[in-house]
Amino acid sequence: MPKRDDIKTILVIGSGPIVIGQAAEFDYAGTQACLSLKEEGYRVVLVNSNPATIMTDAEMADKVYIEPITLDFVSRIIRKERPDAILPTLGGQTGLNMAMELSAAGILDECNVEVLGTDLTAIKKAEDREAFRDLMNELGEPVPESDIIHNLDEAYTFVERIGYPVIVRPAYTLGGSGGGICHNEQELIETVTSGLKLSPVTQCLLEKSIAGFKEVEYEVMRDANNNAMVVCNMENIDPVGIHTGDSIVVAPSQTLSDREYQLLRDVSLKIIRALEIEGGCNVQLALDPDSYNYYVIEVNPRVSRSSALASKATGYPIAKLAAKIAVGLTLDEVRNPVTGTTFAHFEPTLDYVVAKIPRFAFDKFEQADRRLGTQMKATGEVMAIGRSWEEALLKAVRSLEIGADHLLLEEAENADEATLERKICFPEDDRLFFLAAALRRGQTIEQLHAKTKIDLFFLYKLSKTIELENRIKENPQNQEILAEAKRAGFSDAFLATCWNVDEQAIYDLRKAQNLFPVYKMVDTCAAEFESTTPYFYSTYEEENESTRSAKESVIVLGSGPIRIGQGVEFDYATVHSVWAIQQAGYEAIIINNNPETVSTDFSISDKLYFEPLTLEDVMHVIEIEQPLGVVVQFGGQTAINLADGLAKRGVKILGTSLEDTDRAENRDAFEKALEILQIPQPAGKTATSVEEAINVATDIGYPVLVRPSYVLGGRAMEIVESEEALKHYMTNAVKVNPKHPVLVDRYVSGQEVEVDAISDGENVLIPGIMEHIERAGVHSGDSIAVYPAQRLSSQVKNTIVDYTTRLATGLNIIGMLNIQYVVDGEEVFVIEVNPRSSRTAPFLSKITEIPMANVATRVILGENLIDLGYTPGLAPEKQEIFVKVPVFSFAKLRSVDTSLGPEMKSTGEVMGKDVTLEKALYKGFVASGTTMHDYGTVLLTVADRDKEEAVELAKRFNRIGFTIMATKGTASTLEEANIPVSQVKKIGENQETLIDYIRNGQVTLVVNTLTTGKRPERDGFQIRRESVENGIPVCTSLDTAEAILRVLESRSFELESMNASEVKQPKARV
């Protein structure tokens, strides 16, 4: 049927900031959808609050609104733009929930807006646990025995009938938020309480646990003509009980018989047809491994994380086609863009195996609860493609960047028997490595199957990998064994360890027998039809399907999996760099391994290699492509860390030279450069031992800021206030990167300022200067950034421009650089220089309209800024105010301290823009999920050093009508200042304590600056965690609290009676 011509304007709702459970896959989906709709001639309006996305680029839609995805703001956009329809199914849970809110508030009816893709009734049937259960019962499809509960009493009633364990699944939440498996009453109370709070409809499904069943997913598509097809089926290695986002996943499924596959396929198609979904849908099923019994677990009536994985695994662009189906086109009339000849209703066929492994942030959160369950904890994921399951798995392992190039983790190999058993029986993020360790110690696959319920097939494959390891060790430099190992996915680095030689020796050995990988094409049809997809993976076979073109090429290294400190901002820069390379007339080639991102959409680059970002794997691509050079500036620390090895192998690193990169990142070299350039920095030195660090700290005075070289996201960075704390830090931190010393700096508590700049070697362009609201000491990624800077004098700005220009030219930077300064009065000190793209580049690019990664790439390729049309120096400042507000995923990471410091903790960001700082901040806070109450109770419990400052904040909160609550010490200080305050008991005291007030909803904002709460037993830690668990905003920096206060003051009105007494009282504002 033809596409609809009765609609002209479509509003696409984005997914907002990156959080655990909702990451870059929705930038990929949203970008595809916007381009797909524009391709069909529709006027597209986009709303999304995340500036770090490709989808919020001005070219992606006819109108782009970077505004909060809240009922208030989206309603305003609808009333202004008057769209004929909205498409909410490509914005994750955020998009679906917003569509439901708009409908419930009557906005869609008022403005006569139609919902495309999946109608609201279908969304309700899939998302509302009770409606979903009723639908399954109607269809005669089995669901686990369950009950809908709205309070704890109903939960007790269900458990009395069924017994433990039970699974809690909150309605309308993301990534299993608030859910979990409960084995006892204490766990039930905690999980149900949390789940009901996080569910927007205060509803949970309690179901009988079927943990141990196989978990299988089907990604399905349906159009308005009721044509339905399976894009991909995937099998979780981990059985039911671990969230699919935290599971190792294989596509296509490996252990289903044809009968099982067809049975579950028919069920999935039956469900999508019953829901009348038009577009993409994900069906999750549980299969009894010992019979043909199955249960339907849940349905996502939208494009999801699994959709992105299925798209990259098959090459079938689900989001693009879902958008076309939403406007009336059918699967049998839309061509498959991969083959260009077949139509979209042909089900993809795979002649390879895909493995996905999640990436967790536990390297940053040592205190976090690492146990896996039904609530997702991974921040990102990697994908690898091979001809066998074991090859794909080993390629995925070395893509993770966790210091393992094989199924070998030191902690697992050295673990005692008790730890080994615990790690195997109670899964954590690293269970795969403990399974391998158990096999090395002689445990059988039958024993491991009994403990884990992982299918014997996967355990058998693991055991064969371990067997091959042993044969490798027993037969050093054996050519046949070497060839077998390479076919099985073993890395040169691991083989070198086995044979006690260096990696180059293994390469030479392979070269002598011409043992190199070939590249196969991902074509959706297992070579049944001719395809020209420029999408490749490596394997050790005979026929190579990737041929070098006559055009000169440039390779861009991607940034790998999303993790804290290296997020979607780097993928944004990678994509823009690719576009710039193409504009300059070169062939652009990407190497990356993240299935969620826009950069791994094969239509973005001229060629895509889906490969691990290791020296060996990257060099293989370079050898076949023979590029002009490699760009490493946009792939975060992942790419920068490869530069040295590539250069040693004769590869040309484009842009800033390796020597100059090292001058910026190596402390001693950087200090010498600053001396020559006469630019001040806080006093400090490098240290390679505990004794050396103590001597440096004694010389410059405490507090000191300590951090290792060559890290991203403040990894292992800390403010240390005493010799004892420094000793403790040094015994942990120096392990982080033993090749580089630890930096010990005097901590300057001034105002932090951040600058991104582009240099062509002679001219330096500074798009903007951003100031941080939080003073120095809070990681820049966790600080609220403001542009243009509001509190800097002209003299300070001029100094910053001068220093930035001198640093860029003095360090011979070609391309991008990011500099962080601290301003103390009128003095400016440089803290660090990063000779690469930064986290703030997308934010600055959007607001200054200078496409930084694009311009930097053109400069890297040899052009100069003036010829490109840019005037060196600071670009003219915009009139509007823009803020970048961090977003955290603390609710998903229990046991993690929420206090902010030098180590980064945020997973994403949002942008607020308006004509005043207060309005921009309001938008930023609201978009980040902070609830802005106009009245209520503020709980203040602050460190002694902050009490004086807290008095002024308390006065202002009181003036606008807030009640102040404080613990004894803080309360005494406030009483002395004549501020009305209610004193509350500390944790551990008799009667109601402050924790009770937090749990009972009597507190609307918590301000807590007790920075000694790193260990869970500390009071400060408990206060902050309870606040997060109960959805109460908590500020661990007085600067953040002051920013919230400014917003609240701007929204209040002064009230004064006409018969005011002669003794004037302070005016009350509400």
UniProtKB/Swiss-Prot annotation:
Any Pfam family the entry gives: MGS
Chain residues that bind Mg(2+) 2: E298, N300
Domain MGS-like residue range list: 930-1070
Listed EC numbers: 6.3.4.16, 6.3.5.5
UniProt keyword annotations, A-Z: Amino-acid biosynthesis, Arginine biosynthesis, ATP-binding, Ligase, Magnesium, Manganese, Metal-binding, Nucleotide-binding, Pyrimidine biosynthesis, Repeat
SUPFAM superfamilies: Carbamoyl phosphate synthetase, large subunit connection domain (SSF48108), Glutathione synthetase ATP-binding domain-like (SSF56059), Methylglyoxal synthase-like (SSF52335), PreATP-grasp domain (SSF52440)
Annotated source species: Listeria monocytogenes serotype 4b (strain F2365)
Pathway: Amino-acid biosynthesis; L-arginine biosynthesis; carbamoyl phosphate from bicarbonate: step 1/1; Pyrimidine metabolism; UMP biosynthesis via de novo pathway; (S)-dihydroorotate from bicarbonate: step 1/3
Binding site for ATP 2: R707, R746, V748, E752, G777, V778, H779, S780, Q820, E832
InterPro entries per UniProt: ATP-grasp, ATP_grasp_subdomain_1, CarbamoylP_synth_lsu, CarbamoylP_synth_lsu_oligo, CarbamoylP_synth_lsu_oligo_sf, CbamoylP_synth_lsu-like_ATP-bd, CbamoylP_synth_lsu_CPSase_dom, MGS-like_dom
Positions of Mg(2+) 3 binding: Q820, E832
Chain spans, region Carboxyphosphate synthetic domain: 1-401
Function: Large subunit of the glutamine-dependent carbamoyl phosphate synthetase (CPSase). CPSase catalyzes the formation of carbamoyl phosphate from the ammonia moiety of glutamine, carbonate, and phosphate donated by ATP, constituting the first step of 2 biosynthetic pathways, one leading to arginine and/or urea and the other to pyrimidine nucleotides.
Domain ATP-grasp: start-end pairs: 133-327, 671-861
Molecular-function GO terms, alphabetical: ATP binding; carbamoyl-phosphate synthase (ammonia) activity; carbamoyl-phosphate synthase (glutamine-hydrolyzing) activity; metal ion binding
UniProt cofactor(s): Mg(2+); Mn(2+)
Binding of Mg(2+) 1, residues: Q284, E298
Annotated binding of Mg(2+) 4, by residue: E832, N834
Family according to the record: Belongs to the CarB family.
Recorded superkingdom: Bacteria
Segments forming a coiled coil: none
Binding locations of Mn(2+) 3: Q820, E832
Free-text comment about domains: The large subunit is composed of 2 ATP-grasp domains that are involved in binding the 2 ATP molecules needed for carbamoyl phosphate synthesis. The N-terminal ATP-grasp domain (referred to as the carboxyphosphate synthetic component) catalyzes the ATP-dependent phosphorylation of hydrogencarbonate to carboxyphosphate and the subsequent nucleophilic attack by ammonia to form a carbamate intermediate.
Annotated region (Carbamoyl phosphate synthetic domain), positions in chain: 547-929
The protein's name in its UniProt record: Carbamoyl phosphate synthase large chain
Stretches for region Oligomerization domain: 402-546
